[in-house]
């Protein structure tokens, strides 16, 4: 019997992108936007096979005629009907597997409400009839992917940013900090500052264009004030971008002003600490004996840590906050966009993990609350 039959499925449901594939693989097979789109207009062409909803890339490509909704906001599922559509799409259209034949490993945001984990568990067993499932915390998986069991993970995706200190494989819940500032907010901010340049982006479809500009052109300045001065005095930092209709726009200091909001949330009118300070605060909430290990293992994870220059800037900012003799190391793996998924793939293929799955039988005996006993 070939082991492909029983390979576990690993599904990392991010606020912006859904990553899915088979345990044991080194990268997800399917990566698509966590979007459900519904037509804004009446269908007039009979027999066109128009659907009442589109998911993922198809929704993205037809975005001009759709209203796009993200069922996961700030890392937490807010619309279960749409979430079910995304899972259905993942299993049947992307991976082309029958979920009732494979154990499924799902991921969740740290500090996820209890009711949410129960609902995920319920849908997996009752709607998709999976034989077994497990819910793992995203940041912990990122740490596994970097080959560590101790460290502090700064996980910043599209919907939420967390700093999660982990010691010997255990997340320390009292020291986890959450910042509701991530990729989507940066996209919105870039929309706003591009508007000041006279380019107007307003619809949900245009927001996706701005997201692309952000991903292709933005970077983090090592010294913000100095970079602003450089941008003001010369055009060396300007880049051009071609919009889908052929119009070319010029982007200047917006390139680093946009991600600067991660370090200075006041740019977005938020009163919270930046990612460097949040990381520091998280470390300071931990036991004094383990701080040294955390400072030396700062792991970056998630798509919003992909900006060029972010690791150097974090190094500089945390060095300024930490005790002067402390050794500080920022680990920024090149595949960190997918490190949660990769960690899930590693975890689900460990032989020692096989007794950790929640089986259908256990679910039938205990109900959805079993998830709190088995997954921690």
Curated annotation (Swiss-Prot):
SMART domains assigned: ACTIN
Maturation propeptide residues: 1-2
EC number: 3.6.4.-
Keywords in alphabetical order: Acetylation, ATP-binding, Cytoplasm, Cytoskeleton, Hydrolase, Nucleotide-binding
GO MF annotation, one: hydrolase activity
Claim: Cell cycle is one of the keywords in the record: no
Disulfide bond positions: none
Positions carrying N-acetylaspartate: 3
Pfam families per record: Actin (PF00022)
Leader peptide range in chain numbering: none
Broadest EC class assigned to this enzyme: hydrolase
Function: Actins are highly conserved proteins that are involved in various types of cell motility and are ubiquitously expressed in all eukaryotic cells.
Record-stated family: Belongs to the actin family.
Protein name: Actin-2
Native source species: Onchocerca volvulus
Organism lineage: Eukaryota, Metazoa, Ecdysozoa, Nematoda, Chromadorea
Gene: act-2b
